């Protein structure tokens, strides 16, 4: 029994990458997953890979005093786990956010080396009793944070919009993702819907091939994201909540 407990403590924790084309509700899905997993007692660090739309001011727009930043941590001379932790904003008791801060962008800090990015994910994985959810960008070729997250992740949730944009993105990125380092065949590929126009689910599934499921459009989730309350408010939508629960169970089943 004691040996099992020691092994459990030594196990590295999960990294989950939420990746996909623009407009596929990556951020909404990442935050919804974080909230659900936190409600089950899992500690979560949300990593925002986007430097053009930093996650922190989106997820917690009323926070004005926190001066920490992923960029600040990555550019620090004394980069270590303590420096990472100092730059995490605790949005709830169980969910912390590590991202660029308001009015920051890729030019705010010095260019970050690949070695530093590698070290970041290694340090995060070793954080005790914590899983990591990375809100990725759509550009795996240009974003080091996104590329390393997708390579390193135990679970990659790929979101594709049920339209021409999603189909074209899928065809464009597949040659890159076919590289062995991305374990593309293990991706959990989800088709996401919007309310803009009627979408042909059957035709798009046939065109895209391997699709694990769909994420319905949820007006309340969109509203709460816009209000910056998605981490703290429960969404009253049974179909949407069932989908998020199913995704979370895929992530948590090996723990």
Annotate the PLM regions:
Residues 226-255:
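NTP-binding/hydrolysis catalytic cores, primarily Walker-type P-loop NTPases
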